[in-house]
Amino acid sequence: MTAIIRQFLRLEASGGILLIVAAIIALIMANTPLSALYNEFLSIPIMIKFGALELDKPLILWVNDALMAIFFLVVGLEVKRELKEGSLAQRDRAIFPAIAAVGGMLAPALIYLFFNHGDAIGQQGWAIPAATDIAFALGVMALLGRRVPVELKVFLLALAIIDDLGVIVIIALFYSKSVALVPLLLAALITIMLFILNWRKVSNTAVYLVLGFILWVCILKSGIHATIAGVIVGFLIPLRDKEGASPSEELEHVLHPWVAYLILPLFAFSNAGVSLNGVTLDGMLSTLPVGIALGLFLGKPIGIFLFSWVSVKLGIAKLPDAINLKQIFAVSVLCGIGFTMSIFIAGLAFEGAIEAYNTYSKLGILVGSTMAAVVGYLLLNSVLPKLKQKQK
């Protein structure tokens, strides 16, 4: 396993533990006398002004629209690296996690729609249980230490990267508002400029980031979700320059600790603080939270394992060396931890809907993700080889 992947796994695992802590603190604050302080913090107004351009948003929207664009920039950098030089570069190595990821997105969406097909607003949340929180999943896996085979970690990483790619496509196609033409045309022009810079192998990442900020503003104003700007920039920063150095990896190395230790925990803190005031048992047993929780807890493992098993039996894909189907199933349960990514999609799906949709969707995500984390850990613990005791 390369040094880059090792560093990625260490950061994601420890960052996942920080995510859990941030979410617990948010839940406590939202349901105690500290709730007023919590809501005031999220509502802090922040304004950025450049000449005639003025962006005035509360803190929570800066987190969701701006900081998460940086997260998706890192995702873009990671996906490009893995597609060109990493675990997805060779077809025979990429096809197994790719097929698993497709099943892991399809089955949860179908389970969710089974429960919510009669609710026109609820149907919009079909993609909520399709996402996997790689940081959280690796954080749980890290609790088992050296017992986890490297190949199993790489499988989870590759699956999650393809899953992220699917989420990006879903956001672009299904969760964008009505489009404003002029900002969209400007965004297209800047994207062409970035493409030309990439083609000429311009290695100065500052140029890409400045144009990326302008692209983010244009996409924000166009009505398409602004996080897509991060993905575009991530894909268009060169993986190798003319001398063979990697501007992409250098930027990823700089940004990744900020994403793992600040941006994602701050996102979790800002969005996981669900007030249980007014929450009823009937509401918790309604189709929205049940569809999300079962989509994550049952849909993810059913889809990932079924598609994996069928692909191996039909000879379409090959099971990676040093791991078995029992371990694949245990990891597929861990992939039901949707958490930050599911919360992010829920915010897009139910933007403008009554607050109950946001509240119960987040509760469904928290319940489903918690069940997936606990059961996934127990299953992994039972199927992984025990460490040999040193003889005295």
UniProtKB/Swiss-Prot annotation:
InterPro entries named among the record's database cross-references: Na/H_antiporter_dom_sf, NhaA
Q: Sorted alphabetically, which Gene3D superfamilies does this protein's record hold?
A: Na+/H+ antiporter like domain
Primary site of residence: membrane
Disulfide bonds listed in the record: none
The protein's superkingdom reads Bacteria
The coiled-coil segments of this chain are none
Q: Where in the cell is it found?
A: Cell inner membrane
Q: Which GO terms describe its molecular function?
A: sodium:proton antiporter activity
Stretches that traverse the bilayer = 17-37, 59-79, 95-115, 125-145, 154-174, 179-199, 213-233, 254-274, 290-310, 328-348, 363-383
Query: What are the alphabetically sorted keywords of the record?
Result: Antiport, Cell inner membrane, Cell membrane, Ion transport, Membrane, Sodium, Sodium transport, Transmembrane, Transmembrane helix, Transport
**Any single GO CC term annotated in Swiss-Prot or TrEMBL for this entry:** plasma membrane
- Catalyses which reaction(s): Na(+)(in) + 2 H(+)(out) = Na(+)(out) + 2 H(+)(in)
Membrane topology is: Multi-pass membrane protein
Q: Name one Pfam family in it.
A: Na_H_antiport_1
What is one Gene Ontology biological process annotated in the Swiss-Prot or TrEMBL record?
regulation of pH
Family designation: Belongs to the NhaA Na(+)/H(+) (TC 2.A.33) antiporter family.
Q: What does this gene product do?
A: Na(+)/H(+) antiporter that extrudes sodium in exchange for external protons.
Q: What is this protein called?
A: Na(+)/H(+) antiporter NhaA
Identify the species of origin: Proteus mirabilis (strain HI4320)
